[in-house]
């Protein structure tokens, strides 16, 4: 027997074919959400309050500071928040101090700053009762970027951009004449020397001394027509503020506020880190020839001679001295924006681009600006300009903006922080205004602060941001993937239209950080990705992946694990996880396949620095659930990963016989299961609750402590209308540990993800019914409820106050017989358990109609009988088309009972209808390898082909679906599944480290099957064997959310569009099928004149004709002649509105009168046919007409 037994949770053992031992546990898969939000509560909020404090008024004698904050307890627990349609949030209170500097008076006060949405334990938010997820955003990191460009004449040049977190951009570029230009904040370009002069390096000589003598700088100085700092400042001011009269003082303050004011310009922590890293001098000195002698400033010791090459060894020796002051220079700019001294680090080297090797260039670094400085400094600007000139001489590297070292994640915490900042800065403006208006002696912090803008900006973010999404809750895997999603779209990100091929493509730096497989098909491909299984996010927002450290001395793999970002990884050689290791951790082979900067190379074993942790660190959680992934083509694997998220939870879930071992972790971390919070023993188990007696440590002894109650969700509607149901899997007396699964969620079995069912599949054709990927299925799967799922739909009806009086929920509805009311209770609300069909009443409701001027008699009746004479119309809630089922639950909310309802609503009734959907023709099914198809025929069990032992198979798939798609994984799964079924075991075949072909054949032999895994099949109809042996086995098949019940649609009479009077389109509007231009040509080609005329008139927008036709059909008369279609009248009105006098003439030149809609007597009857734009009329249409037709008789 190959493989070894592995335990997954308490209830499942699998035979694992993995050869590589797991050295690292998978992290908690929703940590990206929870830890980011925790950071926001602990530090993010504090940062915001510190940034904005103190707020001072315009005179400077009042100052308001935010000292501390605290979050209270949520008003309702999670379940109740969902039920009441409120936001799950906690009150935020801030301690505010107001200081009056004139009197020295200090006032402290606790100020309520609104309710702040709280993240649930499972990484989601509940906003207005709906569960939402904040998706992490991939954006370009703030930094300085250099890139090469080639102009139209083929000349190579460069561009550079300094991108802040917020603030003005600075861009450098060269032109065809080798002049270096700068653009400030996307304005017109200026020679770069103008910017240097404006900073305070005013003379040509100063600039040449600073940057170093070279032809590019000479060209730029020639182009520059400013002589001193003042002229340069005026020049820049004219570019930034065209049309305003320039003065030197204004120009100074403008430039100062644009770049050196922390409120206007912010690099953030990550920007400062990236700029310091990029402008550090050492990267440009590596392997360059020195043009000066480096001397230790303290001892006078010579560290490196002039003319020496700075290789890795010399550079490592010089590095500590570089950081302690070699090459440091202090500059004293004058007359420009910068008043203080500027510290730089500069070292001279010979330009590698120069053939003679004589040209000396200056390499300038920014002299290690402190991390706390979040805005750009003059030394950053000079160093970036220097880097640009160095690039022109072949020193330095250009950047790849698609590299994950240059893209970072904004997770929940940071997105919230940015939103909160917007709210606070709006509030700051209000506070300043109020400070100057109100009396300074009596004022309190509470009176100054207006929390509206803060609350509004948070509400706006959760309610309408592109990154705040309605959670995909189809099944646990969909939930998990949604929380781990990375989007490049959204505010501050890319747009679909602008994103090119490069951004979407797989990049070598994605390895172990972003899944190369799981991404949507369609316009968002490559812009929305999924986090890899082992990846983490560091404090700067860069994605890190774990590697095993190789000891450089001994060459052995150590137990130490380092998390590396993409740009750190570029410095190391990394071996794959499948490199063979001896017992002591040394590499067995002399040459190892390894990666270095995106190249796969073979290196000697002593060159390896790190090794992969696991073969599945490349892929995401969903992709890691596909067994034999290594045998599938990537395009099909992408579909497989995406379709698992669309699996509908079944009534009887079953985990896969052939799994990957990832099912347990995915189920546990998704948030769908009930997880034990403390170790203990199970005391009581019910369908709805589990009680666990906690174990507590007292003086090293285990003592029984508190009793914890875990509530289970039973038959709740998920966001997608699937059934969310939890089932206990522990028994009384079980000892449980922290983190253990107590109850399965939807699509889970025995603690593992269970999206579909294991069914017996044969690869064969059958009378052409499985043409084009169609699926033939046995009726047994329908009878035994194998693929039956439960769907819950929610309908609501609200009684509002209208201008004519309040609406009323009642059983007393006009023109409705007692039979239709049989299932309503005395309140007029349907009873739980009733079975309803399309069009049945759910909630009886009447709305007052407009009362016209009453006659004297009516007024008398009104006076005698009171309100009764008032006209009401029926606006009851009815079951929509295709919505029939059983009433599962009814919830009633009343304003009188103190329920929070929207303004103007007095009563709200929610009705839940549950449907049990068996699988049927037209439903979509799929395997895990992207092999999807639609059920074309459900055969009786006796007609299905059967095995020699008489077992009929369950599903027939077309063998032609395999070769061209190249997803051979499904065939291996089929064979392995059959062997496992015979052996009575479950299998784990992890991705990239699963069962090899040889293992499959061995397992087949162990199970007593033939090595080709084929078998003779007999035709169920004739009993004859088929000519050839057929591959039959167990495959895991999933029923997808695309069900035929949701898609099938037919219209009788229904609503019409207001202007054209044509039927609406789409199932949701109960619309018709569009008969378009090309369809008209088809009927014309056949000469079907009457059919065509009918379709274009009485079946569409001949208003009078359609009423008469309906009437004729009801009475059994002949159908009348069609009239003029409404759209023709619209066309004429259109032409008349353009000032053309249009007349219609008959064949003998006589004008035809076209009566307008209003004055047409015939259309009075059409009121019943939903010609009004009142939606309720649509439902009543046929009834009214019949009544109308009867009265005419």
From Swiss-Prot:
CDD domains: RNA_pol_B_RPB2. Keywords: DNA-directed RNA polymerase, Nucleotidyltransferase, Transcription, Transferase. Pfam families: RNA_pol_Rpb2_1, RNA_pol_Rpb2_2, RNA_pol_Rpb2_3, RNA_pol_Rpb2_45, RNA_pol_Rpb2_6, RNA_pol_Rpb2_7. PROSITE patterns: RNA_POL_BETA. It catalyses: RNA(n) + a ribonucleoside 5'-triphosphate = RNA(n+1) + diphosphate. It is an enzyme of class 2 (transferase). GO terms for cellular component: DNA-directed RNA polymerase complex. Residues 1184-1193 have a biased composition (Basic and acidic residues). Residues 1152-1161 have a biased composition (Acidic residues). Residues 1152-1193 are annotated as: Disordered. The RNAP catalytic core consists of 2 alpha, 1 beta, 1 beta' and 1 omega subunit. When a sigma factor is associated with the core the holoenzyme is formed, which can initiate transcription. DNA-dependent RNA polymerase catalyzes the transcription of DNA into RNA using the four ribonucleoside triphosphates as substrates. This is DNA-directed RNA polymerase subunit beta. It comes from Bacillus pumilus (strain SAFR-032). The gene is rpoB.
